[in-house]
């Protein structure tokens, strides 16, 4: 992106403008910034990566917004900066912000039991293994709204293991997009918990439940609330739970088959509205739209004169809320690398060392199942986004991208 350009997609009215800058003007080495793109282009040439959009912003200015590779590798169409991606779990920070907005309005407390808003969660049971058999016991302490936000509610994901509870998730087709948020919540509440709430961290469908809480409190669908209260104020015109027909040609696609194992790549169909507006993983967005959201976060709740959250609330959201709460499963442990805790919707860096990737204490990040990823480093006044659709290579590219971004900082 050339100096002086702004973070506004073609055909958009400027709303949340992020001015462009030469990398050197924001403390980045031009040659090392270009090396990042060269590495991504090399991955495309090796047919390891279908295509990607990379964004780096520092000191409120956009130093990089570039597309590489193919938008749709089957069709051979080139990637464009305004490509639309399935962002999966990068939905979670957005929905977490929505819940905290309601908290700031006095609509909820984080200490409130989930059952206060969703009565079906008032009779939950926990699965215990006794002599090789599952026994169900009533929860001693019901899950709270904070448990939903920080993934300590006793819930799980069916694809993260094969425990008896996870098998019940699969048998109930809990991942189906064909039921409403209300019906999903009812179905999930009837399934046993993996552990007592507040005792462990397990990545889970908790943010899907949080989305239903938002619906009950607001009287709107989750999509309506996010659109009116977050997307419109921040100028995120390309973000939603499905892609309308006039934008289908901009949807980024993965390889038909995984370059590592040859298995067929499956991603959700985002061309039609779905019944379930998944608060944990249903949004589609562009790199530029999500950049607006991250600049809002880096600004501690404000963008372009629009304040959606108080500055202290953003600090609270991005603080570590786990402390000594242990991680429950190996699958969840893989998501929180050493030196990290978890806040209210994002992983949070606790220490400079220990982790396998660079980053300042207090930085935070998350990603999506199809490969999208972001990180925000307040100490460096920096955020970066990598948008791609390469599900099985996502961990490799997240680490590679992070390394290359920090290598380019030279002030």
Set out the residue ranges of the language-model regions.
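Short, conserved phosphate/pyrophosphate- and ester-handling motifs at nucleotide-, phospho-/glycolipid
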Residues: 29, 92, 286
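Short, conserved catalytic-motif segment at the N-terminal edge
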Residues: 21-87, 107-109, 123-130, 268, ...
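Short, surface-exposed loop or secondary-structure junction motifs
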Residues: 15-16, 116, 123-358
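Active-site SXXK
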Residues: 34-41, 60, 85-117, 123, ...
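Short, well-ordered beta-strand elements
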Residues: 374-376, 381-390
